[in-house]
Amino acid sequence: MATLLYLTDLYYQAKGRNYYTEDLYVTSRLKDHFDLLIGHPRQVLSNLDCADLIVFRNTGPVMWYKDYFNRFVATALEKGVRTFNSLDGKADMKGKDYLLQLTAEGYAVIPTVERVEDLAQLGMTEQYVVKLKDGADSIGMRIVSREELLQAPPVDQLIQPLLHFQYEVSFYYLNRRFQYALNAPHKEQRWALQEYQPTAQDLAFADRFLAWNNMARGIVRVDACRLPDGSLRLVELEDLNPFLSLEVLSEGKREQFIQRFIEALQEATVS
């Protein structure tokens, strides 16, 4: 059997969900198909040669170990180390600067700028959201007024309009193939998720970002919000270690995803 090094931070305290529960379940299913090693993301550099494939899963925000992660990526690419996800993503894997690029290119994304001189691009709004470029789990996110922004312009951060939306919805992909969708029908409870049946228009929206990212292999979560007019706007494109919320799925859909995940990992160890 091929050997996997499965990276996770079992002690990370995430908002609204338990990373360790998901990874304990997933690894319990993988162990019958692979020789399985479990490691912490900040120990991977000394273990690059111990597995056929390194699986990057619920490892917490990279912002806490950014320099180490960058060294890992550079070393893995230099040595041709096989990873899942592949390290060629252009979205959250590299921070949130891509939101600026998508805005400039006219994609259906929450409009994003980084300079107060460009606030006009965000339209008329009374409040703004300021985000860290390397943030995750809403860490460092602030809601501020226009006056507050102008008085203390943020440095090396992102600025977005505070949108009033109906709900958030996420589309989950494995090797560019759609798997399932979940939404939070009550925006005040963003982690109270339920299965969602996407329309053809919904999937066309999400597929466009998959095509833009053009990542070779892995799990990608397309997070979006539904505006009052029914349109969708991208919130973020999580292409490094998206939480899967498997516990929300029906037993049949969860089993289907796990089997496809196993097959994708097996393929990645030999391709």
Regions of interest found by a model, annotated:
Residues T83-F84, I110, V129, L158, ...:
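Structural detector of well-ordered beta-strand residues that form the stable sheet scaffold
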